[in-house]
Amino acid sequence: MRRALFIAGQTYLWLNLTHLLLIFSWSSTMAFSQSRRLLTPTVPCPTLLGIDFLILVLRHFDEIFI
């Protein structure tokens, strides 16, 4: 039971951190797009790097706790 709660807590934490990263990278991309007067925002590179980092961290937790 404790292990399930710990894994659920870790998952919730990482989902919140990913959500904040997506909001930050999207807002910076929109600001960059508006400064260059582009109508459509580009795909933010920090978001893709953040997702890759999240996958790497989750694999690390998978090796340790499961």
UniProtKB/Swiss-Prot annotation:
The entry's cellular-component GO terms read: endoplasmic reticulum; membrane
Q: Which UniProt keywords apply?
A: Membrane, Transmembrane, Transmembrane helix
**Superkingdom classification of source:** Eukaryota
Q: Where are the transmembrane segments?
A: 4-24, 38-58
Q: Which topology term describes how it sits in the membrane?
A: Multi-pass membrane protein
Q: Where in the cell is it found?
A: Membrane
Q: What is this protein called?
A: Uncharacterized protein YOR032W-A
Which organism does this sequence originate in? Saccharomyces cerevisiae (strain ATCC 204508 / S288c) (Baker's yeast)
Phylogenetic lineage? Eukaryota, Fungi, Dikarya, Ascomycota, Saccharomycotina
